[in-house]
């Protein structure tokens, strides 16, 4: 099982976040770097994702992008019993 800790204070762009997830969780080369593709990949992944300082996403990415990203994480974890999400 892949384990990934995302420190939101260190994420400054959506592209950086998608790249981190793709590289660390081994997404396929054709990963689309968007929220729909993220959901698809996460619902097919066995992983534990921990997000530190989630409030920093809103500061760094903007409120709407941060909310959308976190919603995809929650929805993916709900749909996939092999995906564990920890928000700290």
Residue spans of the language-model regions?
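Positively charged, polar, low-complexity stretches
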Residues: 1-88
